[in-house]
Amino acid sequence: MPPMELGKTKNVHIVGIGGAGMSAIAELLLKSGFAVSGSDLASGEVIDKLRELGAVIHQGHQAENVGASDVVVYSSAVRPESNVEILAAQKLGIPVIKRDEMLGELMRHKSGICVSGTHGKTTTTAMVATMLLEAGQSPTVMIGGVSDYLKGSTVVGEGKSMVIEADEYDRAFLKLTPTIAVLNSLESEHMDTYGTMDNLRDCFAEFANKVPFYGRVICCVDWPEIRRIIPRLNRRYTTFGIEEHADVMASEIEPGDGGSTFTVEAFGERYPGVRLNVPGRHNVLNALAAFSVGLEIGLPPERIIAGLARYSGMRRRFQVKYRGADGVLVIDDYAHHPTEVKATVRAARDGWKEHRIVAVFQPHLYSRTAEFAGEFGWALSRADTVYVAGIYPSREKAEDYPGITGELVAEASRTAGAKNVWFTEEHEALLAALQEEAAPETLFLFMGAGDITHLAARFAAWCTEMRSNADATAS
């Protein structure tokens, strides 16, 4: 593949470079030969990796950071009217664009495979990427998460395909140019952007119809809202699902060994013995989306099946942080919507039937907690024990949401029938409580999009230390 070009642009400055989507685009630009600088309020592993790749990153926002940039890129999380770097760039006449516009430009000379949906985007995008790489297709890839298989969030390939996670937040995906558009799931989310479900549905329909006449839309018919969009499509489409009749379906699903084995039925053909090494029925559904993409681009079914078998998961997507000989498991997952929490708890319950499930959930955003407290409580109630942490505010402020705390979720879980439910605002107290819970055949399931991941890492480290001490004593 020739180097990506953006006219005479060579120096790109990224405001908020440490965010999942922004760090991925920074990584892609660096690997494509651009000089990248950036700024972020936080530091950490992602920032360290970008520096290793050659990025110049400043902690905090300062006007002088924009320097000799040819363009300044920012995300939906940044307020352009008050950010000093954006204001400085505008004063200097430097173009200022949003992340999705930059991504759309990078896609211009590629055949885009864009995976959208309120759930499963990251996993499905990574499955498609793994499948294409295993088939020797050499795609360019950009995912809003970290894959050990990809050794990061991006791949710059020589092939014609570009596999992209298409984010619906702030209507970002409407800047993309898909040749294949995957509608993986759809339900109420990001109402701060859309206001109504009708608006969200309209936006997904607009995204799907951006596919050219020679492209295809891949639709999950297990989601009622996607079934409502299908009659509005003016492009060819393939359907997939488990619960509903579809062009591509899964049957004979057998969970076990941390994953699932199942049969794919596609356009009248049967493909038994498909193996997926990540747990959960929701991941079987994600695999069907990838299978449908593979068929559309002409991959032999055996190559598709081999690629799916090689998929090993994403960081923070049912990621095993600790596995003890006594059956103790520590899992870290990004689930932060009731549907995701329900699917993740079910995956734990189905995959480890003999284990006691201890769910540790950190609500993300006051607005989301206020809207979905009841649904979160019900989703968590299938666990044997539930711990709810304090809300991770992200871009929101507590004073704007009086009375909204994690206790709402805890109380909803009790109402849904959970017997052992605790709300603990402070992480130190929560860590101490979890240490008391540690016992053989216990699965600790940490869920949330905030800093609960750090608590999962600390608890996993404590489990490792306890095991080492026990081994030393025994010897």
UniProtKB/Swiss-Prot annotation:
Biological role: Cell wall formation.
Known catalytic reactions: UDP-N-acetyl-alpha-D-muramate + L-alanine + ATP = UDP-N-acetyl-alpha-D-muramoyl-L-alanine + ADP + phosphate + H(+)
Matching InterPro entries: Mur-like_cat_sf, Mur_ligase_C, Mur_ligase_C_dom_sf, Mur_ligase_cen, Mur_ligase_N, MurCDEF_pg_biosynth, UDP-N-AcMur_Ala_ligase_MurC
GO cellular component: cytoplasm
Main subcellular localisation: cytoplasm
Pathway: Cell wall biogenesis; peptidoglycan biosynthesis
GO biological process, one term: regulation of cell shape
Organism, scientific name: Chlorobaculum tepidum (strain ATCC 49652 / DSM 12025 / NBRC 103806 / TLS)
UniProt-recorded name of the protein: UDP-N-acetylmuramate--L-alanine ligase
EC number: 6.3.2.8
Cell wall biogenesis/degradation recorded as keyword: yes
Keywords: ATP-binding, Cell cycle, Cell division, Cell shape, Cell wall biogenesis/degradation, Cytoplasm, Ligase, Nucleotide-binding, Peptidoglycan synthesis
Record-listed ATP binding positions: G117, T118, H119, G120, K121, T122, T123
Keyword set includes Cell wall biogenesis/degradation: yes
Subcellular localization, as worded in the UniProt entry: Cytoplasm
Family of this protein: Belongs to the MurCDEF family.
Enzyme class label: ligase
GO molecular function: ATP binding; UDP-N-acetylmuramate-L-alanine ligase activity
